[in-house]
Amino acid sequence: MAEEAGTATGRAPERTDPSGPTRAATRRRGPLAALLAFLVLAALVLLVPGGEPPEEDCRPLRVSDWRPENALTEEFARYGDDNSRLDDWTGGDGSRSLPLPDGRTLWLSADTFLDEVQEGRSRDPESVWVRNAGLVMSRDGRLERTLLGDGPRAWFPGLATADGREVWRWPLAGVVEPRTPGSAEQVVRVLLWQREAGQEPWTFGVPRATEVATVSLPDLRVESIEPILDPADADPAARVLYGTAAVPEGRWTYVFGADERTAHGRASTAHVARVPAGALADPAAWRYWDGERWQTSAARSAPMALGRTAERGATNTYTVARHGGTWLLLTTDAGGPDGRGLTTVTSYWACGPQGPWHGPHDVLVPPLPPGSDGRALAYNPQAHPSFGDEGGLVLGYDVNVPQEVAAVHRDVALYRPRFVRLDLSVR
């Protein structure tokens, strides 16, 4: 290849030829083309910190259009309204998905209602609910059953503090990987956030720890829950929990996390770790990006740059997906385009999981259910790559009315996931 680029020594003498001027011009362009190629490659390498080679087909990626993905939204409504069982999912948030090897899809849900839906519209204000659940979707896209603990209780069981306060687990991203590195047996690994009951601004729980659950295949039985990281920060807002996204790529799984500065009205800082395939449940195998290289100490993790100010950037539940050779990060903008807060989904792109991330680019204001009258909030945008295609990506988001809990009982649509399909293009 070096010789073809004209960098080898000992060239044969040049010969006079009727096409000489053209050939001479070609010879002059040869070194210039090589120089330009080198500069382009150098620029791409700079796009991927740490000296890692860029993705060969990395391109600046933007969302060019979107439309409602009604089939998925309606499937969750159908399943939730089905009263053939009164101990399964009728609404929830924290909705994430992962494809299983046999063609099924495992959906993960955080706070989940289990109850009867009355006339397809409302639920009893005293409905039973649990801190987490799983949902199994068939190969043909039909939700079939809810995964719970005995009781019914949460699928991933909770704990309690020494003084009796509730400690619960919220499931986040999940992946299918070897049971151990190199093993032929596959299991599901689910990232969990451990949280405990607290007061304002921690009404949604004080962040405590990152854990990983191992779930068997194909029967989806919770086998174990392993502690991964227990942040030592005295300020809960500075504690980084991992798992808002997990992307397998080659020999590694890249796990994304964030602190919780959004509790104080600021953007969260985004972090990334990587783990060898098959080792997610082994805390000793985790490596944390410090801005230049991968470190064994989570305390040395450095935030990835997102947004232009501390008030605009990611929330703690952003999502990351790969599309071709480009990494795409989507989040509810912590600042919003006009400073109004969590209203707009924005995107960033990068040539590697560590960034640098380019953006933000406004994507959409997620549509809310009819009749929400401006009370409802859309949050937790999550990519569902297995439902996308070459030209696009399915994005789900949750809906809630945090200032009026009774509203989600009067109208069950106000606490169910909704979906849109994003068209992606190179910009």
Q: Where on the chain are the PLM-derived regions?
A:
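Structural signature of eukaryotic scaffold interfaces centered on beta-propeller domains
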Residues: T90-P101, T161-Q186, A197, P236-W252, ...
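Secretory targeting and sorting signals
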Residues: E3-E4, T26-G51
